C-alpha cells in the first residue's frame, strides 16, 4: 500500500514538470518555425532586389551580374517577444548572396556575406554594414546589443547554404 501511495505521489509531482517541459518544447518549436518563415521572407526580399537596390545596400556585383541567389540564417528579430510573422518589424540575420553570370559556377561566383538588418514592410528596407576599416563598429551600430555575439558568429544553417547552391545550379543550367 505504501509503495502505491509513494508512486501516486511521485506521478502527481511529475505532472507539472512534464507540463513545463512540453510547453518549453512547443515554445521552442514555434520560435524555430518563425525563424524558418523569416529566413524564407528575407531570402525572397534579397533575391527579388534589383542590382540598383543591391548597390544601395552595399553589394556591388558588377556589370555582368545575373540573378542573385541567397542563403539567410536569422539570429534575432524585433520585437524579441514576437511569435508570428505579422508581429516582426526587423529581422537580424547572417546572409550569403551569390551572383550568377556568364560561366560563373558556384565555386567562383561573386558573393557578399555578413550580418544584415531587414525591416519588413512595404517596401522592405535592407541594411548592410559597409566593409572596410571600422566594420565591427558599424555592425554594432546596426545590430542590437542582445544579438551582437551572434552577428559576429558563423553561418549556422548549412541547409540554407545547400539550398542556395542548388538554386544557383538550376539557374545557371538554363
Where in the sequence are the language-model features?
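Hydrophobic membrane-insertion alpha-helices, especially the h-region
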Residues: 2-26
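Ser/Thr/Pro/Gly-rich low-complexity linker/stalk segments immediately outside membranes or between
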Residues: 26-41
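N-terminal secretory signal peptides
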Residues: 39-92
Amino acid at each position: 500500500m505504501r509503495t502505491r501511495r509513494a508512486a501516486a505521489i511521485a506521478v502527481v509531482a511529475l505532472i507539472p514538470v512534464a507540463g513545463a517541459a512540453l510547453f518549453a518544447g512547443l515554445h521552442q518549436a514555434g520560435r524555430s518555425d518563425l525563424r524558418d518563415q523569416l529566413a524564407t521572407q528575407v531570402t525572397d526580399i534579397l533575391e527579388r532586389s534589383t542590382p540598383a537596390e543591391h548597390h544601395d545596400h552595399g553589394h556591388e556585383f558588377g556589370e555582368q551580374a545575373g540573378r542573385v541567389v541567397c542563403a539567410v540564417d536569422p539570429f534575432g528579430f524585433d520585437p524579441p517577444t514576437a511569435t508570428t510573422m505579422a508581429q516582426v518589424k526587423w529581422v537580424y540575420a547572417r546572409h550569403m548572396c551569390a551572383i550568377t553570370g556568364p560561366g560563373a559556377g558556384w565555386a567562383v561566383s561573386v558573393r557578399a556575406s555578413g550580418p544584415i538588418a531587414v525591416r519588413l514592410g512595404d517596401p522592405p528596407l535592407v541594411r548592410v554594414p559597409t566593409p572596410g576599416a571600422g566594420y565591427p563598429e558599424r555592425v554594432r551600430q546596426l545590430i542590437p546589443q542582445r544579438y551582437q555575439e551572434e552577428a559576429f558568429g558563423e553561418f549556422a544553417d548549412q541547409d540554407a547554404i545547400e539550398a542556395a547552391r542548388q538554386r544557383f545550379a538550376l539557374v545557371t543550367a538554363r
